[in-house]
Amino acid sequence: MGRKLCRGGLAVAACLIVAMAAACSSSSSTPASSSSASGSASPAASGAHGTLIVFGAGTLATPFTAEIAAFTKANPGVTVHSQFSASGDRVKAITQLHQPADVLGVADYSLIPKLMFPANATWYLGFVSNAITFAYTSHSKGASGLTADNWYKVLAEPGVRIGRSNPAADPSGYQTLQMLQLANGYYNKPDLSASVLKNSPASSVAETETSLIAALQSGQIDYLAIYTSTAQEEHLKYIPLPPQINLSDPTMAADYAKVSINAGSLGTLTAKPIIYGLTIPTSAPNAALGEKFISFVIGPQGQAIMRSNGFVVISPALANPQDKVPASIKPLTTQWPASGG
């Protein structure tokens, strides 16, 4: 009998935090979601005032909404405007559309140096990690016989419908393709990736995977390539993929790097552990407030919020290069290991 499938708990190796400590000693039809928040307490309670603009990956919408609520409660003089969509689109909004942002959070830290250095950003932090998986429901085709050992056979069955995000815009999109490439070798099935992807036509590809959750829950699709944190947030069943392929384990970075995929406008992308990145764009209209928010997110209260939303917290946050990080943030970070980001 196959291994029991997971519902709830994050299927990410606990060694992520240990490994980091040892090394250191969202198709374009889906619009960006946006919101604004302000504290309700007396402004006299805090010295922080002004407007803060936060851009984030689609998978950061839920935890960052909670972060913003806690931050504005502690800083009632601050009003926050936020927008969440595919990480690549958030980057392009800054670099190509010249939209103002004080904080940027992406689902793949490497997008910051690759697409923003040196003109639009000069440093970044790695602050949480995640894992890629396939979510499903009890009504998904083949779900009754699904195990952690036969998942790729079930997903390749005729009639199965698989949703995923656009690899040219969203990290989970290209990380899904990288995971499937790794699965080819791990299971010694050279055609595994192609067999699964034949059930994921262009009609089931969206700008962000979070925009397909309703389609999964309503039965329009059977499986959805998604992060384990999001599966937990939405109380979805998901497949506990092994760390050898789910991109969760930094100690396996060299093995992940053996595969790469063409992500269209993002270029050729080599697989790497899933580590979310933070930065303050060089054009930030309120960089000082951005520093306060990032310090909050990577501080104890902010870390607790990220953990409660299914993320693995990297503590202290990894900085690259640390000497470029603002002085107010630097004490909460450590230099990213030379072998890493």
Segments predicted by a language model, with ranges:
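Bacterial N-terminal signal peptides that target proteins for export
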Residues: 1-13
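A short alpha-helix-loop-beta-strand transition element characteristic
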Residues: 124-127, 189
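C-terminal motif of bacterial Sec signal peptides marking the signal peptidase cleavage site
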Residues: 19-23
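Exported/periplasmic ABC-transporter solute-binding proteins
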Residues: 25-27, 31-69, 73, 79, ...
